[in-house]
Regions:
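Transmembrane alpha-helical segments in multi-pass inner-membrane proteins
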Residues: 195, 199-250
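Transmembrane helix-bundle core of multi-pass membrane transporters
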Residues: 6, 10-15, 94-152
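Cytosolic-side transmembrane-helix boundaries in multi-pass membrane proteins
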Residues: 246-277
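Membrane-interfacial amphipathic/re-entrant helices at transmembrane-helix boundaries
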Residues: 1-25
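Short loop segments and helix-boundary regions at transmembrane helix junctions
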Residues: 32-115, 212-224, 241-244, 268-269
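Helix-loop-helix "hairpin" substructures at the membrane interface of multi-pass membrane proteins
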Residues: 132-208
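Small-residue-rich segments of transmembrane alpha-helices in multi-pass membrane proteins
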Residues: 49-59, 97-108, 130, 174-179, ...
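Loop-to-transmembrane alpha-helix initiation sites
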Residues: 16, 64-70, 91-95, 140, ...
């Protein structure tokens, strides 16, 4: 195929492919916790809140991803703190941070001299061809840390995802794990922004998990298979986007959505075939 023949000639393609594989692994593992813990709305809030830090860093001439990282982690920890203390409803805190982050980001980006709409679009919808070797290294470090953590603390995190009270009764430090996982979700989101963009990124955390969950209810199975599905969807979408000249993020989400529809329809077809027999 054209993509694979060009892969050895263009460095940006190898960076994009490596980023797709690594982000698929991280989003698959972290997404399992997010979906099972019913934190999808929280993840969406963190994703959009990160745009505030991105805009401030862009205005100041600093690294936008570093700014987004700080803003996202602080937002995630703030939401967890507000929810655990009961100072404000968690969904209200998420809604506030979601809208404020987007507003702050748009404001500071527009104030930057020489600002163009293309600067905004690259972060909202992703621009995988701009992924650098440094981005790939950062994703590789995050992936290694997540895989090590998944091997060491799979059971405590699984208990936390399904029943926090049960986890507490087993002596698991639920508050520490909640804060750590919230920060991990934030870091995963920010390091994947260049690939999917802020608008589409939440789908990469949820769609692979939904696909595997349609076939299995086991947390362990979902945690093992969701990264494989995410990687396959990322690579297939990247290849399709290159060959058909369409946005990579949209191609990836379309591929995963089509897979989910097929997986959901298969049992219905089997039931109809069984009834007819």
């Amino acid at each position: 195929m054209e993509f694979f023949s060009d892969l050895i000639h263009y460095g940006y393609l190898s960076n994009a492919l490596a980023a797709c594989v690594l982000s698929g692994i991280t989003c698959g593992v972290v997404g399992t916790y997010v979906v099972c813990r019913r934190m999808v709305f929280l993840a969406g809030g963190i994703t959009h809140a990160s745009f505030g830090g991105l805009g401030i860093a862009f205005y100041a001439g600093a690294n936008p991803i570093a700014g987004a990282m700080v803003f996202a982690v602080l937002s995630a920890l703030g939401i967890e703190w507000a929810g655990s203390r009961g100072r404000i409803r968690e969904d209200s805190a998420i809604g506030i941070i979601w809208s404020v982050g987007m507003a702050v980001g748009a404001l500071f980006m527009s104030l930057r001299p020489g600002y163009t709409s293309g600067d905004l679009s690259a972060y909202l919808f992703g621009s995988i061809v701009t992924v650098t070797h440094g981005d790939v290294v950062a994703l590789a470090i995050l992936t290694a840390a997540i895989m090590a953590g998944a091997l060491l603390w799979l059971r405590p995190v699984m208990y936390m995802a399904f029943d926090r009270d049960f986890a507490r009764s087993r002596g698991i430090p639920t508050r520490v794990i909640s804060y750590a996982m919230a920060a991990l979700v934030a870091v995963t989101i920010v390091l994947s922004i260049r690939i999917m963009g802020i608008v589409l990124l939440i789908s990469l955390l949820t769609l692979p998990v939904a696909i595997v969950n349609a076939l299995s209810k086991s947390y362990r199975t979902i945690a093992l298979c969701a990264p494989l599905v995410a990687v396959a969807g990322n690579v297939a979408g990247l290849v399709a986007s290159y060959n058909f000249e369409v946005p990579p993020g949209a191609a990836i989400i379309f591929t995963l959505t089509l897979t989910l529809i097929i997986v959901k329809l298969l049992p219905l077809r089997q039931k109809k075939a069984g009834a007819a027999a």
